[in-house]
Amino acid sequence: MTDLQQVVAHSFAALAASRTTFRAQLKAREIGIISSVSFGVAQVSGLANVASEEVLKFSGDIYGIAFNVDQDSIGVVLLGDYWQLQSGDEVERTGRVMDVAVGLGLLGRVIDPLGRPLDDKGPIESSERLPVERPAAPIMDRAPVTVPLQTGLKVIDALIPIGRGQRELILGDRQTGKTTIAIDTILNQHDQNVLCVYCAIGQRASAVAKTIAILKAKGALDYTLVMVSEGNAPPGFAYIAPYAATSIAEYFMEKGRDVLIVYDDLTQHARAYRELSLLLRRPPGREAFPGDIFYIHSRLLERATCLKQRHKGGSLTALPIIETEAQNISAYIPTNLISITDGQIYLSPTLFELGILPAVDVGRSVSRVGGKAQRPMYRAVAANLKLTYAQFEELETFARFGARLDQNSQDIITNGRRIRASLKQPQSSPMTVLEQITVLIALTEKLFDTVPLLKMREAEQALCLATTELPEDFLSRFNSAKILSDDDRNRIIDIARITLAPFQSPPDEDNGITSTPSN
C-alpha cells in the first residue's frame, strides 16, 4: 500500500469512528432587535427573559447594560461606539452581569472602565474577575477606624485627620486645587504600604495625561492603578467607572491590603447618570436628577470600610471629589455626599486667590472619625491649633475696620498669621510626620512669631532640613512612640530655636496688624 493510500485509509477510519461518537449539541441563544438608538442608549425588543443589569452583546463587539426592563422593551445603556448601531440590528443575551479584571497585574497600568488597557504596555495579565456592582461589607465584618492615613499635608494631618477606611469628601469650586490634594495624598503613600486607585470620571484627556505624568515622574505609578473615563466617551462609561474601580480596590482590600481610592469627580458621575436617566425617560426630580441619585452614591461609598482581622484586616479609604458652583455647598449633590461621607475638606476660592495653598477652609472642614485615628503626638501639639486659628480669623476681620486692639489680640493675630503661612505647602511636596510635628511644635511654642512673613517658607525649610540631622536613636524612638516624651519635645524645641534664630527680626518689622493677608 502506498503512502497516499495509507493516508486515505486512516482518514476514512477516523471519520467512521467520529460518526459513532458524535452527538449533536444545540445551544439556545436569545436574540433581540434594536428598536431605536440615541446618544449612549438603545431600546431593545424581543428579549423576554432578560434580567436587570444583565450585559447584552451588540454587533461590532459592543456591549450594553439592561437598565430599564419593561414588558415590551428594554432600555440599554451602551458601552461603546453607539453610532455604529442602527435599528434592526441583533442583540444577544450573555447571561452575566458586568465584571472587570482584578489582580496585582493592574498596578502601574492605565485602563478604561471595561478593563481594557489605554497605555502601551500590552494586554492586562489577570485571571480573576469581579462584578462591577458588589454589596458593601456587612456591619459585623467592619472594624473601627483606628489607623491614620498620612496625606503629607500639614493642614489635613494636623487639623482634619483622615483614617484608613474613612470616606472624606473633597469639595470646592473649579480650579481650587481639589485634584492636587488627592494626588499629593497618593504621592505620600510611597512608603506607607498603601495601594492606590485613581478613577478619572468624565475628565479632559489633557488633564488626565498631566496627572499620569506627575504620578510617573514621582514613582507613584508603581503602586497605583489609573482608570479613565474620558469626557468625550459615552455616558455609560462615566456611570460604571467608579463601581469598576471600587471592585478592583476591594480585591486588594480583601487580600488584607490597605487601599486608597480617589473619585475625580462624582459631579461628572451624577451628571452622566442624570443624562442616562433622562434619555431612558425615567421621571426627573430635583435639578432634573432621578429620584435614586442619593442611592447610587451611597451604595458606592458604603463599600469603603475597614475590615476586622478575621477578614484579613484590609481597608479601603475613599476620597470622593465634587465640584461646587459659586461656593454653594448646600446644593443637591454636595449635601447628599456630605451626609454620606465621614467628613469634608472644603477648598475656598478666596484663600486660593490669596495664594494660600492648599486653600483649605479649616472652619468649614471637618473629619468625623479621623480624629480617633490620629496619632496622639499630633493631638498633643495641635489640639488648640484649630481654635487659635479660628480666633485669629475672627480678630483679623475685626481689625480690618481699623479697631484698636489690646496686646493680647495683637499677639493672637501675629501668631495666627504665622500659622496661616505655615499651613501653605507647595504642590507635590509631602512632608514626613517628623517634619510636620517639628513645625507644629515651633508654631505652638510661638517660635515663628518673630520670623517675618516673607521668610516663613525659607525658615520652615531650614527647620525641616535640621530634622534630618537628628541621631538614629531619636528617630527610632520617635517612629515607635505614640506620645512624644518631654525630653524629646524639649530637644525639638531647642533645635527649632537654634535653626530659626538667623531668620528672626524685631516684632515691629511685621506687616502691620490691620494689613490684609500676605501671599
UniProtKB/Swiss-Prot annotation:
The alphabetized UniProt keywords are: ATP synthesis, ATP-binding, Cell inner membrane, Cell membrane, CF(1), Hydrogen ion transport, Ion transport, Membrane, Nucleotide-binding, Translocase, Transport
EC annotation from Swiss-Prot or TrEMBL:
7.1.2.2
Can you name a GO cellular component term? Answer: proton-transporting ATP synthase complex
Which terms in the Gene Ontology molecular function aspect does this entry carry?
Answer: ADP binding; ATP binding; proton-transporting ATP synthase activity, rotational mechanism
**What CDD domains does the entry give?**
ATP-synt_F1_alpha_C, ATP-synt_F1_alpha_N, F1-ATPase_alpha_CD
Q: What does this protein do?
A: Produces ATP from ADP in the presence of a proton gradient across the membrane. The alpha chain is a regulatory subunit.
Please give, as recorded in its UniProt entry, the membrane topology of this protein.
Answer: Peripheral membrane protein
Against Pfam families, the record matches this protein to: ATP-synt_ab, ATP-synt_ab_C, ATP-synt_ab_N
In terms of InterPro entries, this protein maps to: Alt_ATP_synth_F1_asu (IPR017710), ATP_synth_asu-like_sf (IPR023366), ATP_synth_asu_C (IPR000793), ATP_synth_asu_C_sf (IPR038376), ATP_synth_F1_a_nt-bd_dom (IPR033732), ATP_synth_F1_asu (IPR005294), ATPase_a/bsu_AS (IPR020003), ATPase_F1/V1/A1_a/bsu_N (IPR004100)
List the residue(s) that the UniProt entry marks as the site Required for activity.
S365
- UniProt protein name: ATP synthase subunit alpha 1
Q: Which organism is it from?
A: Psychromonas ingrahamii (strain DSM 17664 / CCUG 51855 / 37)
Q: What is its main location?
A: membrane
What subcellular locations does the record give?
A: Cell inner membrane
The catalytic activity, as recorded, is: ATP + H2O + 4 H(+)(in) = ADP + phosphate + 5 H(+)(out)
